[in-house]
């Protein structure tokens, strides 16, 4: 099965991990306009209490997070590092990330995504079996836990 994930929010990354937990052979591709997962320049960010976040997700969903990141208070810095750690682990599990990639078109009848990006795969058309869009305000919908909250910077 081929799963296309649009966006790289914590919720999108959680979704990718859940898919791979259920079926490790799934081909997961994350398309994001961000240059680097975990450090997007947006005016709409998440705050997490890192201690609570790490308790609510499986250990195999994230890699190491620097010890200097405060784990007790809500912060966007903690959310950025958690996103980065979850993305790293997702790639270790076989997911593919297309960074600096803009979705040009989604053909739902053909189950195809047309994209243009700045990475190794500059542009193209990918087929998918499942498409999940976590861009914009959709990025803030929690899948299960409520360890984070949305803020405006």
Task: Give residue spans per PLM region.
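Predominantly flavin-linked oxidoreductase catalytic cores and closely associated redox partners
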Residues: 28, 93-153
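Beta1/beta-strand and adjacent pyrophosphate-binding region of the FAD-binding site
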Residues: 1-11
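N-terminal FAD cofactor-binding segment of flavoenzymes
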Residues: 14-70, 80-81
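Surface-exposed, flexible loop/turn segments at secondary-structure boundaries
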Residues: 11, 36, 139
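Short beta-strand/turn micro-motifs composed of small residues
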Residues: 7, 32-34, 135
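Class I S-adenosyl-L-methionine
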Residues: 17-20, 87, 91
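Hydrophobic alpha-helix position signal
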Residues: 54-56, 90, 98
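Short beta-strand to alpha-helix junction loop
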Residues: 69-89
């Amino acid at each position: 099965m081929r799963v296309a994930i649009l966006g790289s929010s914590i919720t999108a990354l959680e979704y990718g991990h859940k898919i791979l937990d259920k079926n490790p052979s799934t081909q997961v591709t994350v398309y994001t306009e961000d240059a680097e997962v975990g450090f997007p320049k947006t005016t709409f960010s998440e705050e997490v209490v890192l201690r609570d976040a790490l308790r609510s997700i499986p250990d195999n969903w994230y890699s190491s997070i620097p010890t200097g990141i405060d784990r007790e208070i809500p912060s966007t810095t903690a959310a950025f590092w958690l996103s980065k750690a979850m993305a790293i682990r997702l790639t270790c599990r076989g997911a593919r990330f297309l960074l600096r990639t803009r979705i040009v078109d989604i053909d739902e009848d053909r189950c195809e995504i047309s994209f243009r990006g700045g990475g190794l795969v500059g542009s193209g058309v990918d087929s998918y079996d499942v498409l999940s869009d976590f861009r914009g305000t959709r990025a803030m919908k929690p899948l299960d836990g409520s360890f984070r909250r949305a803020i405006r910077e």
